[in-house]
Amino acid sequence: MSSPQPPRFDGQRWSNADDDRIEVLPADPAWPQHFAAEAEAIRTALALPGLGIEHVGSTAVPGLDAKPIIDILLLPPPGHDPQRLVAPLEGLGYQFWRENPNTQRMFFVKGMPPFGHGRTHHVHVMPLAQADRYLLFRDWLRNHPDDARLYAETKHALARRYPTDREAYTRGKDEVVARILGRALAATRHPMIQSGLVRGEREMHARELRETLVAGAESTPGGPADTAYFESLRSRVSKPQD
């Protein structure tokens, strides 16, 4: 009898989807500590001067129900080849999605078989113009409990509807994410609003807005187009948005 094959990963789902179920749990005050411990391990493994490491996603918002997965955003300095991040992260137990059709982004997952019993961490690497959206969304939810509550209710409903389909779960959040992010962009007078690239939530269809925000600059992580964003983004990182 042939030995069992390890699960295959397509970026959203493993072939053993029943072992990768979506659960949205009550907020855990230990999540920031889990991030801090993993961030220190990553910083040590990469040994990259100037590296930014940010806690993003729902576990980075105090009091927000979330999937118990720590999302980590890496901000390598301009000029650094992001492919050099792969081997050290794999050494920490991360699996790199090499078949990602979006070549501007890199995605790593930790905790799935045969290395563990379920997702525990995600690591994201992307152009800084895209990273900016993640940080803005996080900081807005930290300071706007009504939007955080709306987001949590949406996630609970989608997790009940799509317990093993992460692609459908993520797609189902599009409209709410777009509305919240549109408010954040407008209220903070974000450069994307000032430049006319984004006209605000009322003038833009939800999917169009989200695709604009998630796509960001058409560049590779660490590429030349990132340079202009780097200092301004790093100066604003982790500052709450009022």
Curated annotation (Swiss-Prot):
InterPro entries: GrpB/CoaE, NT_sf. Residues 215-242 are annotated as: Disordered. It holds the Pfam family GrpB. It comes from the Bacteria. Belongs to the UPF0157 (GrpB) family. This is UPF0157 protein PA4798. It comes from Pseudomonas aeruginosa (strain ATCC 15692 / DSM 22644 / CIP 104116 / JCM 14847 / LMG 12228 / 1C / PRS 101 / PAO1). The lineage of its organism: Bacteria, Pseudomonadati, Pseudomonadota, Gammaproteobacteria, Pseudomonadales.
